[in-house]
Amino acid sequence: MELTCCNYYGKECFERNLLLSTPTMDLLKKISTSFPDVFILEPRVFGDERGFFLESYNRKVFAELGITHQFVQDNHSRSTRNVLRGLHYQVQHAQAKLVRVIEGEILDVAVDMRRSSAMFGKSEAVALSGENKRMLWIPAGFAHGFRVVSAVAHVVYKTSDYYAPEYERTLLWSDPQLKIDWQLEGEPIVSAKDQRGVKLRDAESFE
């Protein structure tokens, strides 16, 4: 590969060429979870005294990891400590999600809602933060939610389909059957809508 500085000068030119010369698979580390199709993505971070640079999305790299979805929507939420959102999913226009935190920390949770899955009703909880810069890939067929661990958290995520409120469903976050350890610190802050979520035994699901 021919490396050029283009409009980059000095140290920035060196860093750009370093990025271009890095094998694509080395730009993003794939970490397994208890689900074969849910995984953590850890980007390579280029940092110095000025700060850092990373690629949060690269279509080619993601395709090499098996993620070929076309993302159609980006969402950004700001929440304060102990806010709990979820567990949300859409029974039609089901969404795959790529979740990351740009500031603060959350406990991110995915619940398998596919009745044909041996893991139906099971969950995965992952710590995502602005510090660890990890992302969580959640395919369609899962309910998703998170609890804020830090004082404030900014969560951004890509979706593979548009928000469709008429098909949105909420799984009750506190359903004992789910056995989710939210690592609570007192009573969480939950919207009235999420408090009205249904238990797994009564929830609409996927095949």
Where are these regions (language model features)?
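Cysteine-centered motifs
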Residues: 5-6, 13
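Compositionally biased, intrinsically disordered/low-complexity regions enriched for serine, proline
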Residues: 17-20, 136, 185
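Non-catalytic, conserved peripheral segments adjacent to functional cores
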Residues: 25-131, 152, 159-207
